[in-house]
Regions:
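Catalytic center-proximal scaffold of phosphoryl-transfer enzymes
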Residues: 11, 39, 86-87, 103, ...
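Short, flexible loop/hinge motifs at secondary-structure junctions
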Residues: 1-168, 238, 244, 288
């Protein structure tokens, strides 16, 4: 429409002018919504492990590669001045065999050494060889005889004594199978091959499944004890990830302390599942990401993960105009925060940590309050700023509370093995399968945190289960004890 036509309508036809103005207003509003939708889709399209919670395995093909570390200028291998490391010789009391070797002839003149000359020999050069002996399972047959009573003619058969497994496999073999499955993530068929080739044990796929389920059943009490320890802990790292049961979507929750780990498979990521895991009266501090299911927790009893916040700020720094400046400023503050935390971990000076954190708090508060204003055009970083202000105390719990870190890396590392297990095994196939993997994963990660042997622990559990003794727990006071 030309200007003259518009002026003619305005001068001559008031109703038409009003209708056109209303239509223009509708189009402006529609355009605003479309621009917001385009911005949202572009932001979603640009998501990667650099700027969101996506794992690196889900990065899109167009995602920029991770920045490479600059070359150090050093050659490969040992560096000049580096103290070399060699395999240490075992002491004599730990050797199974000592074989003496003597030279027969002089390498210079071919003199044949006599026995009396061996007495003048110097300290020998020692070379130790570590070898696996031929390994084979032992098979014991228990014969239960039946006798007829000469008095009443009743027949009585002997019973298996306590400590003899009712199944066809002993506790050490069962513990080995369970360890291969949960810790080493070996498939059923590969487990059959390993047991046959290494130990001469012939098993079937059904036997493997039965052994793993039996191990899960035996871990019922230790798993319940772990749950009690988590709910009474002073600080807990918690996270969740996807799971599959019979092809249906489920959620694997993980709660970890410094020395324990507990996993639970639930229907979803809802707040009720977080409460079911931590308990209704949990009084400790929870470190997590900003997932809404944790919002029922008081901000002063939480610690938000700064690694997640760094990725959020990275996403905003890749936006436009004010959003980009907001993201860059947030990343700069985050970098200084991690530097202060690294210094604290090296020197343990909390007073100095608080002195370094104080100006960062002031800068971030100003940044967030400016971004949270209604005049901020980009709603994404306005909403993000409002969310951080709402949970403000949860940003700084690590700075004044022992045993709390600024990131949730502890929980994410604990879940990593479970995620790999899910991808290799395709999850679970039944509710009992869920229960079994919950308990085995909990025992596996807890043993790793406590620097214990999972195989040795499962052996003790299965042995106690066979004998009817109390099941050993996973409570340990310190590493190596």
């Amino acid at each position: 429409m030309e200007r003259a036509e518009a002026e003619a309508i305005l001068d001559g036809d008031r109703e038409t002018a009003v209708a056109l103005l209303l239509r223009v207003g509708e189009l402006i509003e529609a355009n605003r919504r479309l621009e917001a939708r385009v911005a949202e889709l572009e932001q979603r399209l640009n998501r990667s492990s650099r700027n969101s919670s996506l794992p690196p395995s889900q990065d899109p093909p167009a995602a920029p590669p991770r920045p490479k570390q600059p070359p150090s200028g050093r050659k490969r291998g040992g560096q000049a001045g580096h103290e070399g490391r060699h395999r240490r010789l075992l002491p004599l009391e730990r050797l199974d065999e000592v074989v003496e070797h003597w030279p027969e002839r002089c390498r210079s003149c071919a003199h044949v050494f006599e026995e009396r000359e061996l007495l003048d020999a110097a300290e020998p050069w020692r070379h130790q060889v570590t070898e696996l002996p031929p390994i084979a399972v032992t098979v014991s047959e228990h014969r239960l005889h039946r006798l007829r009573c000469p008095v009443c003619a009743a027949e009585t058969r002997a019973e298996l004594p306590a400590g003899v497994p009712r199944s066809a496999f002993g506790p050490r073999l069962q513990a080995a199978v369970a360890t291969l499955a949960v810790r080493n993530r070996v498939s059923r068929r590969d487990t059959l091959e390993l047991m046959r080739d290494l130990f001469g044990a012939e098993l079937a796929t059904g036997s493997i499944d039965a052994i793993i389920e039996r191990a899960g059943d035996a871990l019922a009490d230790p798993h319940a004890t772990l749950l009690e320890q988590i709910r009474s802990a002073a600080a807990v790292n918690i996270d969740e990830t996807g799971w599959r049961t019979a092809g249906q979507r489920r959620t694997l929750w993980g709660a970890l302390t410094e020395r324990t780990a507990l996993f639970r498979i639930a229907p979803d990521r809802h707040e009720r599942e977080a409460k079911a895991l931590l308990g209704d009266d949990f009084a400790g501090i929870t470190c997590s990401d900003r997932w809404w299911a944790y919002n029922y927790l008081h901000p002063e009893r939480r610690q938000l993960c700064w690694a997640h916040l760094a990725r959020d700020f990275t996403a905003h720094s890749e936006g436009l105009a004010a959003q980009k400046e907001f993201g860059k400023a947030g990343l700069e503050i985050t970098g200084r925060l991690f530097a202060a935390w690294d210094a604290y971990r090296n020197n343990g000076d909390r007073t100095h940590l608080l002195e370094q954190i104080a100006p960062l708090q002031a800068e971030l508060r100003t940044l967030l309050e400016q971004a949270a204003r209604k005049s901020t055009k980009t709603k994404y970083h306005r909403q993000f700023a409002n969310n951080l202000l709402k949970h403000w105390p949860a940003l700084w719990t690590f700075s004044h509370t022992d045993g709390v870190e600024p990131t949730n890396n502890h929980a994410e590392r604990g879940l990593r093995g479970a995620v790999i297990h899910r991808k290799l095994s395709l999850g679970s196939q039944s509710q009992r399968g869920e229960q079994t993997i919950e308990r085995l994963l909990s025992a596996s990660i807890t043993c790793r945190l406590q620097q214990r042997s999972l195989f040795a622990y499962l052996t003790s559990v299965l042995t106690a289960n066979i004998r009817g003794d109390p099941i050993p727990t996973l409570t340990r006071s310190s590493p190596g004890t």
